[in-house]
Amino acid sequence: MRVVHTINELRQALAATRPAALVPTMGSLHEGHLALVKQARDHGGPVVASIFVNRLQFAPHEDFDRYPRTLERDCDLLKGVGCNLVFAPTESELYPEPQTYKVQPPGELADVLEGAFRPGFFTGVCTVVMKLFQCVQPRVAVFGKKDYQQLMVLRGMVRQFALPIEIVAVDTARADDGLALSSRNAYLSEPERAEAPQLAATLHTVQAAVLAAVKSGARIDAAALEAQAMGTLRSRGWAPDYVALRRSSDLQAPADPTAEPLVVLAAARLGKTRLIDNLEI
């Protein structure tokens, strides 16, 4: 496995190979990231993992400065699962001048849910991913479903810009107790880590209620289910930003929750740590 830090080195390394499969990451890797690399290997060609903590997707009050940076450990993990090339640019390499040209996704998808609580987040994500796509020129790019809204935004970007890239989605990797794996789980104290699986459990409760209503033909009151779920989290010491039942096709509120595929998404703070999760229904 080779590690490169400049765009020129990256392009030289890929010049004589088949089109690559790209796994974009911010580092601080866990088993969920490694599952993406393993999936990328199934698509032929070299597997490229990028490691870059992207300032553009962090608000000033967020955790850019303290986000874990563990490049040596990450490279060891990537080598162990068959990654061929790691692209780990510096900030000045990827952004040699102020990034005044940005990719602005549509508000109906990017300004709701995560976008409502993290203004500019998806603009930062789309801009850096577009730049990585231009650097790597992959045939396939692999993303996890844990960041469900991000996945949908990026699929839309690829479609509307006619990029010749297949976006592959991989199911959320979870700990044995159900907690979605995340680099930010490292921020949790021991008591918080014990409580953290309750976020997934709350989503399972919503999922079960929807499936039971569909089976019985009962009316689904999405707003009531969302409010009940948020109340459950608050009663356990969480500070929820949202629990939202949405159409999985476009993340809009369903006119008839019994008639179309759904996803329930949530974001909540436990102590100082903000966690997100989702379940398809």
Curated annotation (Swiss-Prot):
Q: Any idea which residues are catalytic in this one?
A: H33
Report quaternary structure and partners: Homodimer.
Q: Which gene encodes it?
A: panC
Q: Where in the cell is it found?
A: Cytoplasm
Instruction: Kindly provide the name given to this protein in its UniProt entry.
Output: Pantothenate synthetase
Please report which protein family the annotation says this sequence is part of.
Belongs to the pantothenate synthetase family.
Q: Which Pfam families match?
A: Pantoate_ligase (PF02569)
- Which reaction is the catalytic activity of this chain? (R)-pantoate + beta-alanine + ATP = (R)-pantothenate + AMP + diphosphate + H(+)
- Where, by residue number, does beta-alanine bind? Q57
Gene Ontology BP, a term: pantothenate biosynthetic process
Known InterPro entries for this protein?
Pantoate_ligase, Pantoate_ligase_C, Rossmann-like_a/b/a_fold
Residues involved in (R)-pantoate binding:
Q57, Q150
EC number(s) stated in the UniProt entry for this protein? 6.3.2.1
Q: Which Gene3D superfamilies match?
A: HUPs, Pantoate-beta-alanine ligase, C-terminal domain
Chain positions recorded as ATP binding sites: 26-33, 144-147, 173, 181-184
Key words, A-Z: ATP-binding, Cytoplasm, Ligase, Nucleotide-binding, Pantothenate biosynthesis
Query: Does the record bear Nucleotide-binding in its keywords?
Result: yes
